[in-house]
């Protein structure tokens, strides 16, 4: 999965933030759907997009933008205001010098999991240097 390193860094930061100890942070696995009723809050991180352009004559330097998606799930019994407070804490803890864009969706409901869902997207500049084979 692309953006593995970046997602791992964000997960590490979030797991080590005291305000977020009651939330489980997971890396998404593509093509796996296992709806289940949630009993606690859960945040799932996954790549959202990656756009690169060659910025060198020899096509070894690429620069562009990447985005990491954070889906926060909060059980109905905790109430919808909790999900907004938790997402605010997650975004605040994720901020660093590389983040250049933040967007947060409207709240939605997932009846199969009996939870509220709120999505944030963190955008950043991305540089990749490849060596000729």
Regions found by a protein language model. Name each.
Residues 42-43, 68, 120:
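A broad, low-specificity signal marking well-ordered, structured residues that form hydrophobic/aromatic
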Residues 1-13, 36, 50-63, 99-133:
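Short, charged interaction patches at domain edges and termini
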Residues 72-76, 124-126:
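Short beta-strand-to-loop capping motifs
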Residues 48-49, 63-74:
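Active-site-adjacent structural patch at catalytic or cofactor/ligand-binding sites
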Residues 20-22, 95-101:
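Structural alpha-beta junctions
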Residues 1-56, 78-85:
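Small/polar-rich, solvent-exposed N-terminal microdomains that initiate assembly or binding
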Residues 42, 74, 113-115:
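Generic recognition of cysteine residues
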Residues 77-97:
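Short, hydrophobic/π-rich interface segment
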